[in-house]
């Protein structure tokens, strides 16, 4: 039996109700709706009186936030000013791989627009390393976790009129259902539409209604169901838990062993209240669309194309605007499909749609009725203030009154390439191989009059080195069978530049068979001298390694890539990235002879 005193002590120590129930093995608590109070952060370290609207929750002492709010409301009433509409804005929480500063950008711009439109913006976030948690960004800031119980405490104190969940990434969007259950109005896309996009079965029904194709997929809860589903739809399959961010715990399974390994890991570490999703893996070009919707019309600032093909997380792929390799029919299809989603889901605000293009056919990968990590990028390079417009739509304005038109916005007169930045030297034992699980920790932007110059700028900004081959300079190749045909041309170009080529047994034999001179080198587990000795010689400029199977850090391919990272040798793990890098190497361009594009003065004359 849990006493009231024990319960209150547990709350003072920071335990949530659900944790207390589990540890005390009780179904009911001594008191319901025992809300926390809020203390003001002392930004002056007790040197003198501080009065900043920056609060943290506590079960010990008075509720300073309630007193602060009462004083402000009394001042407003005394001046005869109308009471402002209170809007709770949920931030993105701690920055981690998969959810970065891009979502904080969206939260901050949302707050600015709300304040500009006469609302009182109350921000909830618990990351001190962001702009959103600067004490003067919102009207008030609550430095508390983004979970239902903590949010309920804030709502009990603030009594807001509405909330915004679509600008804080997956962390904030998970609160939509709870907000709907407690009856707090959500500005923008309704909670049911968000669930319809996230829930596999409901999303499939949506696609049927809209007559939009997607890769066949299934929902599974255990290993037997996963194996049966994979056999039904055919290997390879993309496997991921539902309701995840950054492609977390996502893989491409090529055989039954991969499925067995994955399900063993996922059932141990992931809450199986949400199912695992299996999709037929479609090899093709991946594209991304961010759109602003007002419930009737929509505006697409631009279509982005990923350099790496499907199977590589969009956050780890080089992203190009405007798309370089799409036909007009494919572009028109994406615009049409995006409009269908916007209308059918009753989207108000932002929606992100990811597409795969294979053999001229456009497939939908997923739809996210929220902001995405590409919103700051596409806003900057097109001059379309997406978050500002989305918030105004949530407040009832129409796109047709905002001056940017509807449908697909005209392309900019330049090319912008977003290149991911990785921190593998700080992430020990992490395989550098690209895949559906996001690993990048940042990004840079390269802008130029044409694609190759913009790509070169982006790659240099991301830390790639462009070397002129010297005496004995060489490159190492160890690639999987499916990539070998495409690496023939890449290897030829490097050979033509003066590089000596080395390859592990299978890759070396393939290149020599196709008339590309290549020297065999023993793999990392072979007798010395082997590939490690070659890496340590100081002569290797680039490593091209796409051999990967499973997640075992003991595999030769994984150990090779880690060794390259330790020695600061560029290691390319995707054939598309390799082709782009080699084209830049051969162009002989540098930052000295690429013209500057000043986008600040090119926003359509603005």
Regions found by a protein language model. Name each.
Residues 92, 241, 367-369:
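Residues immediately flanking
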Residues 198-201, 244-248:
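Conserved A3 ("GATE") glycine/threonine-rich loop of ANL adenylate-forming enzymes
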Residues 228-238:
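Acidic/histidine-enriched active-site and ligand-binding environments that engage anionic O-linkages
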Residues 20, 234-236, 258, 370, ...:
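Short alpha-helix boundary/capping motifs
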Residues 42-212, 221-228, 447-605:
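ATP-binding N-terminal substructure of ATP-dependent carboxylate-amine bond-forming enzymes
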Residues 1-63:
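Non-catalytic accessory regions
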Residues 1-6, 10-17, 71-85, 104, ...:
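ATP-dependent carboxylate activation and anion-phosphoryl transfer catalytic cores
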